[in-house]
UniProtKB/Swiss-Prot annotation:
Monooxygenase; part of the gene cluster that mediates the biosynthesis of the tetrahydroxanthone dimer neosartorin, which exhibits antibacterial activity. The two different monomeric units appear to be synthesized by the same set of enzymes, among which the Baeyer-Villiger monooxygenase nsrF is the key enzyme for the divergence of the biosynthetic routes. The pathway begins with the synthesis of atrochrysone thioester by the polyketide synthase nsrB. The atrochrysone carboxyl ACP thioesterase nsrC then breaks the thioester bond and releases the atrochrysone carboxylic acid from AacuL. This is Monooxygenase nsrS. It holds the Pfam family SnoaL_2. The keyword Nucleotidyltransferase does not apply. Gene3D superfamilies: 3.10.450.50. It comes from Aspergillus novofumigatus (strain IBT 16806). Pathway: Secondary metabolite biosynthesis. PANTHER family: AUSTINOID BIOSYNTHESIS CLUSTERS PROTEIN F-RELATED, AUSTINOL SYNTHESIS PROTEIN F-RELATED. Its EC number is 1.-.-.-. One of its GO terms (molecular function) is monooxygenase activity. Belongs to the avfA family. Keywords: Monooxygenase, Oxidoreductase. It is an enzyme of class 1 (oxidoreductase).
Length: 150
C-alpha cells in the first residue's frame, strides 16, 4: 500500500527543489537503495534500467558541468493512490562546449518507496533530438576525449 499522500508530496517537492537547484547530492539523497532509472523513449536504445550505482556514475558529472541552470516545471500530476508522479518540464543551461546550450524537454515519471520518503524509480522521457546530439559529445568529454575550450 502506498504511503500517505502528504509524505509522497513532501518527497516530490524535495526532489523538484533539488532538480530546480541543480543539486546532484540533494537529488541522489532522495534515491532509495533499490533505485532504478531509465531513459525514454525506448528508440534511444536505452531500454534497460540503470541501478542506483550506475546512475550515480553519470548524473553528478552532468549536473556539475551545466552552468546557469534553469528548470521550468510546466505540469505535475501526483497519483498518490499508485505512489507515482509525472512531471513535464523544460530546462536550459550553458555547457562545456563553446556555443552549445543545453535545451531539453522532459516528462519524468517517478515511483515512491513504500514509506513515501524516497524515489525508487525514475523514467525520463527526453527530447530525443537533443539527446542524440548532446550525450555522445558529453560522454567523450567526461572520458577526457572531448575538448573543453577555455
Amino acid at each position: 500500500m502506498p504511503a500517505p499522500a502528504d509524505i509522497q508530496a513532501a518527497t516530490l517537492n524535495k526532489f523538484l527543489a533539488a532538480w530546480r537547484e541543480g543539486s546532484a547530492p540533494d537529488t541522489m539523497a532522495l534515491w532509495s537503495d533499490d533505485f532504478k532509472q531509465r531513459l525514454l523513449p525506448l528508440s534511444l536504445g536505452e531500454s534497460s534500467f540503470r541501478s542506483r550505482d550506475q546512475a550515480a556514475l553519470f548524473y553528478p558529472g552532468l549536473v556539475e558541468n551545466l552552468r546557469n541552470w534553469e528548470l521550468h516545471i510546466k505540469e505535475i500530476v501526483h497519483d498518490s493512490a499508485r505512489g507515482t508522479a509525472a512531471v513535464y518540464a523544460t530546462s536550459q543551461a550553458d555547457t562545456p562546449f563553446s556555443g552549445e546550450k543545453w535545451t531539453n524537454e522532459y516528462a519524468i515519471f517517478l515511483s515512491f518507496s513504500e514509506d513515501g520518503t524516497k524515489v525508487c524509480r525514475l523514467e525520463e522521457m527526453m527530447d530525443s533530438a537533443f539527446y542524440q546530439s548532446f550525450v555522445p559529445k558529453f560522454q567523450r568529454y567526461l572520458m577526457g576525449l572531448g575538448g573543453l575550450k577555455k
